[in-house]
Amino acid sequence: MRILLAAAECAPMIKVGGMGDVVGSLPPSLIKLGHDVRVIIPGYGKLWSLLEVSNEPVFRANTMGTDFAVYEAKHPIHNYVIYLVGHPIFDSDQIYGGENEDWRFTFFASATSEFAWNCWKPQVLHCHDWHTGMIPVWMHQDPEISTVFTIHNLKYQGPWRWKLEKMTWCPWYMHGDHTMAAAMLYADRVNAVSPTYADEIKTHEYGESLEGLLNYISGKLRGILNGIDLDEWNPAKDPVLPAKFSINNLKNRTENKKILQREMGLEVNPKKYLLGMVSRLVDQKGVDLLLQVSRRLLAYTDSQIAVLGTGDRYLESGLWQLALDYPGRFSVFLTYDDSLSRLIYGGSDAFLMPSRFEPCGISQLLAMRYGSVPIVRRVGGLVDTVLPHDPENNSGTGFCFDRFEPIDFYTSLVRSWEAFRHKDSWELLQKRAMSQEFSWQRSALEYEMMYKDVCGIKEPSPDVAEVEKFSYGQSADPSLKKG
């Protein structure tokens, strides 16, 4: 099959979250299955120097009242074809935000549609999050191109329909209050990035006011778990790790722990229980829970905590204050550093993910791969990937809690600290975590099944009367509804 992935990110060149990992790492696994897979992304400023880009465009056109050109490049690691949409609107390296964000990504979706119609025509056009949400709408009446829409994070839903109507051509048949809703209605298949998240978003608690619509389309909705690149993330070969190790040789891991402690200003003592966190510092990731339990944990146990990331100012300030109050025991680096993140995965004893919601999560997969035992809230993809530790039966791969409450998180932390003191059983727990297999090849087989299922098929137009029931979401203010 000819498959084109359209997205705002593609790792490692352009990456903010998990979407970048999916778009960057899924194509090689699909190519191994015999498919012609290519990616199209905006031509952000730095890409022109990072990649070897064709001198001449492969396609020129006009859309939304402005000219654009598409250039061909190759992925720097996997060597598959990447198309860059060239236009001055993408010249900066800013991916998200800004006053023109809605226009920027609607234009990208429109340019991608023109390219797919008139240059390289795929059988399946795989769209990712609201940034490409208009593509399934425009492709709806093209019988030769089937569309798949992946929900990475339902919270971000794109511009409202009235704004889209001002910016660009909206088909007469279009329904859905905003880009995300329209994409889900008109895509031929929809998937979330884990089976549990696919179920959760059909409920009021996690549906972001789209639960009614998601139940309406549930027949074409499924969950496919993300994976990781096992070659790129291999503690036995990772060039960044000072000490390489494997599931059969964990002794070297202690050296990484000591170096991590030194680099982050913690007391260098491998006997201390070291908790790591690599995350965007936002409410979704449960950083506020960490702020609420850290003082009590540090008072009761001899634990150390190392945090790496950036995010909301008030959360950064809270973490910084803890570092000032507990020197040598609590450390935070308010930046993102790939080398340091790998050292946290490969040197910490346990890894923190107390998320409010988690569509899939990549960090817990990396942590387990590198022998850092995950401590997670049982939500979204964390349910599908982390098995609760059961000391009586010597089973499980991490520590789990259910409610988003400080006491529940704290209890899991203390349980893990107590387990850490029993070195033999802790090493068995580490090895069970490291033995889990979350490769992209497994995920690619599921995507291939979905592509084959949808190839050459167009879903019927949505029932207008049914769609109107979900307009503006079940929890929205009815007074906002347009006539």
Curated annotation (Swiss-Prot):
<keyword id="KW-0328">Glycosyltransferase</keyword>
<dbReference type="InterPro" id="IPR013534">
    <property type="entry name" value="Starch_synth_cat_dom"/>
</dbReference>
<dbReference type="GO" id="GO:0004373">
    <property type="term" value="F:alpha-1,4-glucan glucosyltransferase (UDP-glucose donor) activity"/>
</dbReference>
<keyword id="KW-0808">Transferase</keyword>
<dbReference type="Pfam" id="PF00534">
    <property type="entry name" value="Glycos_transf_1"/>
</dbReference>
<feature type="binding site">
    <location>
        <position position="15"/>
    </location>
    <ligand>
        <name>ADP-alpha-D-glucose</name>
    </ligand>
</feature>
<comment type="function">
    <text>Synthesizes alpha-1,4-glucan chains using ADP-glucose.</text>
</comment>
<dbReference type="Pfam" id="PF08323">
    <property type="entry name" value="Glyco_transf_5"/>
</dbReference>
<dbReference type="GO" id="GO:0009011">
    <property type="term" value="F:alpha-1,4-glucan glucosyltransferase (ADP-glucose donor) activity"/>
</dbReference>
<protein>
    <recommendedName>
        <fullName>Glycogen synthase</fullName>
        <ecNumber>2.4.1.21</ecNumber>
    </recommendedName>
</protein>
<dbReference type="InterPro" id="IPR011835">
    <property type="entry name" value="GS/SS"/>
</dbReference>
<comment type="pathway">
    <text>Glycan biosynthesis; glycogen biosynthesis.</text>
</comment>
<dbReference type="GO" id="GO:0005978">
    <property type="term" value="P:glycogen biosynthetic process"/>
</dbReference>
<comment type="similarity">
    <text>Belongs to the glycosyltransferase 1 family. Bacterial/plant glycogen synthase subfamily.</text>
</comment>
<dbReference type="InterPro" id="IPR001296">
    <property type="entry name" value="Glyco_trans_1"/>
</dbReference>
<keyword id="KW-0320">Glycogen biosynthesis</keyword>
